[in-house]
Amino acid sequence: MEMFGVHNPAIELATVGLGGAASVRYNFSAAALYEEAIRRGEAELTAQGALRAITGQHTGRSPRDKFVVRDINTDGEIWWDNNKPISPEHFAVLRDDMLAHAAGKELFVQDLVGGAEEGHALPTRVVTEFAWHSLFIRNLLIRPDTAALSSFVPKLTIIDLPSFKADPARHGCRSETVIACDLTNGLVLIGGTSYAGEMKKSVFTVLNYLLPAKGVMPMHCSANVGPDGDAAVFFGLSGTGKTTLSADPARTLIGDDEHGWSENGIFNFEGGCYAKTIRLSAEAEPEIYATTQRFGTVLENVVLNESREPDFNDGSLTENTRCAYPMDFIPNASKTGRAGHPKTIIMLTADAFGVMPPIARLTPDQAMYHFLSGYTAKVAGTEKGVVEPEATFSTCFGAPFMPRHPAEYGNLLKELIGRHGVQCWLVNTGWTGGAYGTGKRMPIKATRALLAAALSGELGQVEFRADTNFGFAVPVSVHGVDGSILDPRSTWADKAAYDAQAEKLVSMFIANFAKFENHVDGGVRDAAPGVKVAAE
């Protein structure tokens, strides 16, 4: 076996059974990985110098093909209602077959770290058969300095072989695609998919399993910090504005997607960003756009024209087009990936039912309730006319990546909020003046003004009213914001229609939360919404 690149000679691929590879390229730089990816026909260069790759059949994650090994250690620790088990025996066969499949191949290795706080970091070795996957994960995780590579010892190994096709009967999985996590032995196997995001989210899943046992809260969130050290955390599902609203030129970006909250404060799990690019423009998101125009960035499933210029408005391959770049490509990004304890937590929702106010203050019990609910709403396409919004509840704002029971994360979050006196807000970036189809999208200018007031502490000084449906505190008036949007009911022409819509949404919340009732205390149960129709 030929070996190239800096690495720890005591921890070679033979230690995980990959000694039969034809060659191994350890910790190659971006330039070297560009050369390899283009030489092998995996990717092509854009006019501006980014590397574009197409993932084929899978243009997003495959949550139905993700499995966790159910063994003596994980049996009582994992939330099996939400995580699919695979037996140790099936996993062993899958592992052996994947190792055999890798024999004779050129492989790429990156030795990286998940977690910017040293005491909670996860040294991770990622073995890939694609050079562009190696560049992707090099961009996304934290890179140790060169001197540290010669003594690097991984605690997690990911083996990523897109050309391997699983056999459901033989391997105990669902299809030819498989993502299998052995949490006890620190091994993740990915086969049958070229979508690079599976690697990133596998690291997140493992950290979400390991950290709560150490009293550290893992979070699917973005985070930033002000000039006075006032950190803020932004929870939110896809499409709620998590990346957009945390990108604030007046504040330093800590990270855009995954963080931990320890006894020392918050820290990024990653060293890069994986941003959506569909309809990306220099005007709306100049910093993210700029990363797509330079060497080192990976563009995933972005359409190029004949001149190799990216067309970010073309979603013909997928709406889930992405770019992956190192954190230091963003001008105001944190160099450490760390900050103190958050002063503010923002929970984002895009309420397409038009019921929720643009901002509401949450008590710790209400914060835990809405964290466990993880609500937003999807809207369908309008080709066949307006359709009903669809409520989406993804507990902890990231159910697919949470191996433990949601109550573990919720109780830890509530305890940290109380201990550090964190102010929590629910921010609705969805619809006002009616539901999707009749109302309009919440003005981004108003959202930014309300957010700025919340982060500065100004919002805490205004008069509040209790929301008649959800019980949380809503500001009556805020300087610089049109007062009419603060009371959603008043923005609807048909008040009875608003009341009916509110009752419908509240009933969805209650039905969804039923599965958590026995796992939370009375204070959180009492934070549930209840309809009280307002006077005309």
Curated annotation (Swiss-Prot):
Its EC number(s): 4.1.1.49
Subcellular localization, as worded in the UniProt entry: Cytoplasm
Upper classification of the organism: Bacteria, Pseudomonadati, Pseudomonadota, Alphaproteobacteria, Hyphomicrobiales
Cofactor(s) of this protein: Mn(2+)
Gene: pckA
Organism of this sequence: Rhizobium johnstonii (strain DSM 114642 / LMG 32736 / 3841)
Signal peptide bounds: none
One of the record's GO molecular function terms: phosphoenolpyruvate carboxykinase (ATP) activity
Main localization (coarse): cytoplasm
Summary of the function given for this chain in its UniProt record: Involved in the gluconeogenesis. Catalyzes the conversion of oxaloacetate (OAA) to phosphoenolpyruvate (PEP) through direct phosphoryl transfer between the nucleoside triphosphate and OAA.
UniProt: Mn(2+) binding residues: 201, 220, 257
Entry keyword Iron: no
Cofactor mode of binding and number, as noted: Binds 1 Mn(2+) ion per subunit.
Keyword terms of this UniProt record: ATP-binding, Cytoplasm, Decarboxylase, Gluconeogenesis, Lyase, Manganese, Metal-binding, Nucleotide-binding
Reaction equations catalysed: oxaloacetate + ATP = phosphoenolpyruvate + ADP + CO2
Protein name as it appears in the record: Phosphoenolpyruvate carboxykinase (ATP)
Gene Ontology BP annotations: gluconeogenesis
Domain of life according to the entry: Bacteria
InterPro entries: PEP_carboxykinase_ATP (IPR001272), PEP_carboxykinase_C (IPR013035), PEP_carboxykinase_N (IPR008210), PEPCK_ATP_CS (IPR015994)
GO cellular component: cytosol
Residues that hold substrate according to the record: 61, 195, 201, 322
